[in-house]
Amino acid sequence: MAEEKKRRPRRSKANLIECINNAAEEQIKKDGFSNILVTDIIKRAKIEPVVFYKRYHNLETFLSEFVKNYDYWFSDVLKDLKSPVTSKEGMTEIFQRLIVELNKDSVMLELLRWEVAIGNSTTSRTAMLREIHIMPLVKDFEVLFHDKNVDIAALTALIIGGVYYLSLHKDRSPFSGIDINTPEGMCRIQKAIQYFVKKIYEENKLHDDRKLIAYRLKEAGVSENVIEQCVWGRK
């Protein structure tokens, strides 16, 4: 009598979902969101097709659920900072940590790539949710730099956008002669972030110093016109 085929141990619903998600994560890191196939996920997860389709109507439905695991990704970058978020050191650490995390060939990097390449309900939602999660931080910085001649929202957009592009471009060619795949290249970008943030905060302090000088000159009886010209450089 032929031996009965050994059955695989029955897995719980939570375990199956975890297996499917882990398989998708590995496949996405390898091929990206645009090239992923259900058959690849099934093969990696070592499940039957019926198990996948019992839970997800199609690949689009699965990906819509899967990317929700990354809705709070930017918020996670802000966790356990060594310095207050709105301090010079805090801002520096946020942007430096951002490029380090993206440089790990993460699913998040592939999600950014997918958002740029493909417009659909899922990519629109993930991009908008990230914007919503970033805005409280931007608002905190805007309060700090209020009336300081510094458009901090625009400056942080340039830094974050630059970090995103450098990360997305890193496997195509160096950028401005800098290869962030190398320790030397990454170090140069980290130092540039530190320098850029330092200048932003120096401008903030300079504005406060000028206000104090203007106030003292006014108290000393110096005319408004002279103060405007000498302190603020206005004609």
Q: What is each model feature region?
A:
Residues 45-49, 223, 234:
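Short coil turns linking two alpha-helices in DNA-binding domains
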Residues 74-78, 120-146, 153-154, 187-191:
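Amphipathic alpha-helical packing segments from all-alpha helical-bundle domains
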Residues 19, 27-61, 65:
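Helix-turn-helix
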Residues 102-124, 169-176:
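Amphipathic alpha-helical segments used for helix-helix packing
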Residues 141-196, 200-207:
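Hydrophobic/aromatic-rich alpha-helical bundle segments in the mid-to-C-terminal region
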Residues 65, 79-104, 108, 147-156:
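Hydrophobic alpha-helical connector segments
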Residues 13-25, 41, 66-70, 74:
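Generic hydrophobic, amphipathic alpha-helix propensity
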Residues 1-14, 207, 221:
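N-terminal intrinsically disordered/low-complexity leader segments
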